């Protein structure tokens, strides 16, 4: 126990330097020393605010079991004296600290049961939120008028408390998930300048978030997470009742039904609150018995398991097998299935729900009691973990001091006894979870004995070859396979693997060998799989995933057999193995218009303030979507143009998200630039060039982009740290590039190429639209005009989009000497071929050889530059080659035969390049391929350009 004593003495000395502790009674001194040893949070709170200890002891709060009335009246009294928001922020933070110290003190010293703690933590949060909301609502009514509906009825502000706050079971150090709403549209009354209710309540919501979430010298009250609102981060901060109802009826998803079970309305009593409480019941609780909820919960649990593996979480009492989340899923499965017919199940709290399940006979009482016991045990552990440092953690500690703190509070004399009890409780929970929600998937048959011996025994080369030959491989192939397998075994011996991992590997490999031997080139496939196995050998969770899911193992081998690139991707990022569990999803990429929504959903699980996790998650999302696209591509369920569409739309969704978070970071630091104050614009655009602009991205494509901002940006930002608007946009661009190019565990997001901006590498990072246009008109080379043909805005607002499109059309449509243009393009093409073509005699470079893809792209650009002065609107509309050729045919610039030959050749060459890329092969092929296509392109080129 010396570690606890040392910690207590250290904190006691620091506290004694701030306040005289000699007057403490012996019992008070004993309690203080105990709690200082157990909690850094309590110690640091008392050191920051020494008078707090005297206050608590004098008022006997530390010995009071029911403190709800004290919390309410004390907070009302403190807020009644508040005159401004700065003071409000301070009062809320100090009040929260004081009462959280009381909660921690009582629970850590065994004075309070878990139920008391959960009750008071949740009640404290309710009062802080409600009284903060009430003060700000009144203040804003004085400033902007009272919000009314069209009938002149005052409109109140309501909050959905979600998650554990909604269920009144908030944990000690927790985010609070909120959704804001108000009843009806209308305007404010009482001030000369009226504003609409949406604007009033949006501003109020922002002030409430600031009052609770913002970190000041006194800390914060709660981390506020608003991402569960309709349409997530891309949706408005607040919506009215009608819009909320419409959203959940039209767009509500299974996970939102699950989330809304615990949604509790906070706000003033009355008809509006009653209406709101009834509003979403039809969405959450179906009138029929809804067994589809089981599959939805199963998928959600699979996503959580995937996250645990992805983050490498170990000993996580919330998300791990048998953790708190599985208990919640058990209870909520019954609520979703039967809650529409059994109103008793429409309750918010987990403990209450479990008790109801026993009362109505849905689950035997002894099993409910087992779940309740486990829940109380796990939540008690969670509270202690969080009371140590007021940190949101559910992972068991790995340092001896915190381990000792945990077992001391939990009543154990050693770690092993505690850990055994914890595992026993979690095993019980997982068994119950499997009974209610577990997957019915049958385990695969074990591979036959011979293959088990091949893997487990040290057979000679001759014996292994003979065994494989008997399994159907020809003798030469069997010998090569035996050699490759022996090499794999030798490599695995060099890698650390525990007993559990070794046992799993020994079960997995015979089955894997059996499946590999069915393929035409099992040696090559084994070599591809070897790289993955070496990467995951020390990560037992992934070995278990493949061993326990035969379907996932089969999908893995199929994809790796078809594509070296996919095999390498899986080896570099084994987190993607989780995506193999659902073949229906795997071969069905996200719909083009849904990438933004899917990205928002994926990012919901990541704390907004944790930029490192945000960057990592963005890369994981991209890799997952790449896998879906590649799988569908390999399966030929989508064709080449669709592959490029998917890759391009994905890049645009990621670009949109990155710009948004970069913008929020900049605004948080410097405020809004003056040119957009009072609007929802950013005055900023990203222009995609090259393959991104032409909607022709491949798997390894860079993003060629140019950044633009508004023309008139004189002035500065309106934040506490004001900077010039020009500097704001420059730093915004730098931030965007950093978010894309920073290397995390999952690599970079995309390579960003800025060389096509005005003046190239020597040019400024962000240009105004006017200076961009001026440069292109007066200083740009012909090749820059060619590049402009494939340019389009990929992030923008309407105003800046219109200006960019006008600039692009003006430049592309300017009159040119077509003969001189043809000469320039021809000369440029010859230079490129000389420096970039890789083919040798008897070979063909799909990209650079005569008749190759670049010839076709240059020809499309020539057609636009040569003829846009006569038909600019039509020719400047598209940035992709195929639609440019189609437009030229409609305008009479190409014959139907010429259009077909060009598009046919371009698609064939791109498809071939694409297939080679999937297997990480060079674009150089034998010279006897695509002869007719090449001749067609050369003939058309010569007709127009020679």
UniProtKB/Swiss-Prot annotation:
Belongs to the GlnE family. It comes from Psychromonas ingrahamii (strain DSM 17664 / CCUG 51855 / 37). SUPFAM superfamilies: Nucleotidyltransferase, Nucleotidyltransferase substrate binding subunit/domain. One of its GO terms (cellular component) is cytosol. It is an enzyme of class 2 (transferase). CDD domains: NT_GlnE_GlnD_like (cd05401). This is Bifunctional glutamine synthetase adenylyltransferase/adenylyl-removing enzyme. It catalyses: [glutamine synthetase]-O(4)-(5'-adenylyl)-L-tyrosine + phosphate = [glutamine synthetase]-L-tyrosine + ADP; [glutamine synthetase]-L-tyrosine + ATP = [glutamine synthetase]-O(4)-(5'-adenylyl)-L-tyrosine + diphosphate. Keywords: ATP-binding, Magnesium, Multifunctional enzyme, Nucleotide-binding, Nucleotidyltransferase, Transferase. GO terms for molecular function: [glutamate-ammonia-ligase] adenylyltransferase activity; [glutamine synthetase]-adenylyl-L-tyrosine phosphorylase activity; ATP binding; magnesium ion binding. GO terms for biological process: regulation of glutamine family amino acid metabolic process. InterPro entries: GlnE, GlnE_rpt_dom, NT_sf, PII_UdlTrfase/GS_AdlTrfase. Its EC number is 2.7.7.89, 2.7.7.42. Residues 448-946 are annotated as: Adenylyl transferase. Its cofactor is Mg(2+). Residues 1-441 are annotated as: Adenylyl removase. Involved in the regulation of glutamine synthetase GlnA, a key enzyme in the process to assimilate ammonia. When cellular nitrogen levels are high, the C-terminal adenylyl transferase (AT) inactivates GlnA by covalent transfer of an adenylyl group from ATP to specific tyrosine residue of GlnA, thus reducing its activity. Conversely, when nitrogen levels are low, the N-terminal adenylyl removase (AR) activates GlnA by removing the adenylyl group by phosphorolysis, increasing its activity.
């Amino acid at each position: 126990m010396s570690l606890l004593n040392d910690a207590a003495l250290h904190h006691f000395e620091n506290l004694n330097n701030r306040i005289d502790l000699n007057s403490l009674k012996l019992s008070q001194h004993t309690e203080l020393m105990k709690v200082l040893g157990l909690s850094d949070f309590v110690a640091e709170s008392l050191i920051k605010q020494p008078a707090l200890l005297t206050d608590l002891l004098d008022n006997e709060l530390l010995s009071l079991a029911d403190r709800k009335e004290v919390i309410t009246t004390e907070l009302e009294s403190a807020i009644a004296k508040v005159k401004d928001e700065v003071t409000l922020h301070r009062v809320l933070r100090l009040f929260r600290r004081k009462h959280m110290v009381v909660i921690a003190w009582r629970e850590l010293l065994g004075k309070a049961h878990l139920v008391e703690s959960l009750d008071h933590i949740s009640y404290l949060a309710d009062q802080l939120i409600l009284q903060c909301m009430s003060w700000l609502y009144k203040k804003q009514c004085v400033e902007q008028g009272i919000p009314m509906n069209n009938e002149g009825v005052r409109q109140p502000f309501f909050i959905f408390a979600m998650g554990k706050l909604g269920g009144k079971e908030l944990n000690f150090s927790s985010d609070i998930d909120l959704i804001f709403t108000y009843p009806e549209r209308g305007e404010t009354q009482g001030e000369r300048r009226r504003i609409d209710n949406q604007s009033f309540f949006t501003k109020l919501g922002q002030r409430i978030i600031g009052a609770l979430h913002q970190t000041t010298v006194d800390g914060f009250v709660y981390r506020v997470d608003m991402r569960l609102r309709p349409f997530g981060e891309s949706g408005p901060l607040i919506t009215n009742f009608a819009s909320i109802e419409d959203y959940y009826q039209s767009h509500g998803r299974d996970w939102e039904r699950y989330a809304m079970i615990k949604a509790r309305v906070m706000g003033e009593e009355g008809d509006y609150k009653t209406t709101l409480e009834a509003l979403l019941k039809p969405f959450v609780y179906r009138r029929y018995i809804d067994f589809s909820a089981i599959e939805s919960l199963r998928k959600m649990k699979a996503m959580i398991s995937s996250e645990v593996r992805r983050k490498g979480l170990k000993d996580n009492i919330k998300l791990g097998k048998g953790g708190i989340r599985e208990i919640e899923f058990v209870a909520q499965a019954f609520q979703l299935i039967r809650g529409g017919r059994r109103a008793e199940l429409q309750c918010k709290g987990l403990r209450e729900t479990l008790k109801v399940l026993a009362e109505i006979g849905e689950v035997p009482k002894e099993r409910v009691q087992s779940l309740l016991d486990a829940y109380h045990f796990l939540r008690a552990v969670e509270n202690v973990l969080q009371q140590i440092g007021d940190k949101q953690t559910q992972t068991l500690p790995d340092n001896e001091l915190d381990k000792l703190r945990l077992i001391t509070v939990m009543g154990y004399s050693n770690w092993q006894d505690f850990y055994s009890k914890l595992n026993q409780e979690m095993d019980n929970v997982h068994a119950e979870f499997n009974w209610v929600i577990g997957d019915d998937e049958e385990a695969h048959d074990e591979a036959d004995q011979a293959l088990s011996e091949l893997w487990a025994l040290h057979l000679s080369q001759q014996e292994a070859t003979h065994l494989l030959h008997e399994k159907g491989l020809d003798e030469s192939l069997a010998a090569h396979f035996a050699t490759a397998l022996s090499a794999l075994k030798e490599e695995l011996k060099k890698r650390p693997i525990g007993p559990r991992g070794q046992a799993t590997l020994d079960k997995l490999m015979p089955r894997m060998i059996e499946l590999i031997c069915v393929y035409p080139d099992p040696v090559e496939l084994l070599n591809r799989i070897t790289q993955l196995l070496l990467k995951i050998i020390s990560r037992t969770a992934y070995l278990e995933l493949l061993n326990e899911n035969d379907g996932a193992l089969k999908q893995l081998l199929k994809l790796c057999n078809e594509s070296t690139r996919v095999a390498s991707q899986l080896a570099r990022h084994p987190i993607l193995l989780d995506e193999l569990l659902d073949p229906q999803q795997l071969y069905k990429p996200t719909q083009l218009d849904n990438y933004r929504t899917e990205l928002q959903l994926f990012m919901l699980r990541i704390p907004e303030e944790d930029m490192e996790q945000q960057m990592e998650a963005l890369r994981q999302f991209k890799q997952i979507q790449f896998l879906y696209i590649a799988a569908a591509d390999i399966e030929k369920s989508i064709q080449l143009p669709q592959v490029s569409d998917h890759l391009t739309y994905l890049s645009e969704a990621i670009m949109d998200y990155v710009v948004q978070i970069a913008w929020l970071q900049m605004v948080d630091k410097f405020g809004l630039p003056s040119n957009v104050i009072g609007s929802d614009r950013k005055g900023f655009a990203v222009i995609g060039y090259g393959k991104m602009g032409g909607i022709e991205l491949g798997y390894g494509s860079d993003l060629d982009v140019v950044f633009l901002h508004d023309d008139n940006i004189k002035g500065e930002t309106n934040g506490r740290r004001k900077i010039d608007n020009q500097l704001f946009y420059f730093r915004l661009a730098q931030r965007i590039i950093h978010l894309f190019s920073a290397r995390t565990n999952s690599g970079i997001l995309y390579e960003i190429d800025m060389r096509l901006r005005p003046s190239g590498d020597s040019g400024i990072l962000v240009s105004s639209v006017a200076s961009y246009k001026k440069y292109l008109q007066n200083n740009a080379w012909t090749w820059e005009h060619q590049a402009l043909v494939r340019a389009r805005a990929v992030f923008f607002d309407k105003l800046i989009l219109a200006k960019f499109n006008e600039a692009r059309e003006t430049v592309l449509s300017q009159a040119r000497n077509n003969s001189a243009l043809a000469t320039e393009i021809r000369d440029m093409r010859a230079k490129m071929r000389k420096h970039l073509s890789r083919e040798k005699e008897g070979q063909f470079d799909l990209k650079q050889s005569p008749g190759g893809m670049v010839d076709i792209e240059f020809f499309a650009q020539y057609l636009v530059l040569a003829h846009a002065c006569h038909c600019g609107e039509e020719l400047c509309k598209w940035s992709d080659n195929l639609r440019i050729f189609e437009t030229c045919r409609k305008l009479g610039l190409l014959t139907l035969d010429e259009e077909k030959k060009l598009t046919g050749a371009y698609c064939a060459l791109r498809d071939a390049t694409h297939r080679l890329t999937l297997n990480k092969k060079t674009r150089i092929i034998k010279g006897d391929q695509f002869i007719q296509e090449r001749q067609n392109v050369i003939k058309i080129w010569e007709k127009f350009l020679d």
